[in-house]
Amino acid sequence: MAAVSLSVSTVKPLGDRVFVKVSASEKRPRRLYFPDTAKEKPQVGEVVALGAGKRNDDGSRQELEVKVGDLLLYSKYAGTDVKLGTEEYVLLSEKDILAMVG
C-alpha cells in the first residue's frame, strides 16, 4: 500500500460533516468571553472543509448552514480529533455545532 500524504486540501468530509481547524485560546476572537464559572467552555474553530450535506429521504441533499471560513463554537467533547503536522483539527457533524460566531 502506498503512503498517503495528508493535508487539509486532501481531507474531504462526507455527508453533514465539517472539518474545523481548532483555534488556540490566545487566537480566539476577543469579542468572545467565557466566564470562569463555566464548567466546560465551548471550543472555537474555523471551518476549512465541508461535506456535501445530509441526504434527505427523497435523495436530495440538505445544504449545510455553515461555509468555509466561518468561526464556530462546539462542545469540547464533540467530533473526532485529527492532527495534521503541528495543526489540530476536529471533524464534526453539523448537529454538534453550537453556534456560528461573527
Swiss-Prot record:
Biological processes per GO annotation: chaperone cofactor-dependent protein refolding
Keyword terms, alphabetized: Chaperone, Cytoplasm
Compartments where found: Cytoplasm
SUPFAM superfamilies: GroES-like
Annotated signal peptide: none
Entry's Gene Ontology molecular function annotations: ATP binding; metal ion binding; protein folding chaperone; protein-folding chaperone binding; unfolded protein binding
Pfam families for the chain: Cpn10
CDD domains assigned: cpn10
Cytoplasm is among the record's keywords: yes
GO cellular component terms given for this protein: cytoplasm
Key word Glycosyltransferase present: no
Subunit structure comment from the entry: Heptamer of 7 subunits arranged in a ring. Interacts with the chaperonin GroEL.
Family in the record: Belongs to the GroES chaperonin family.
Main function: Together with the chaperonin GroEL, plays an essential role in assisting protein folding. The GroEL-GroES system forms a nano-cage that allows encapsulation of the non-native substrate proteins and provides a physical environment optimized to promote and accelerate protein folding. GroES binds to the apical surface of the GroEL ring, thereby capping the opening of the GroEL channel.
Cited HAMAP family: CH10
Protein name in UniProt: Co-chaperonin GroES
Organism: Anabaena sp. (strain L31)
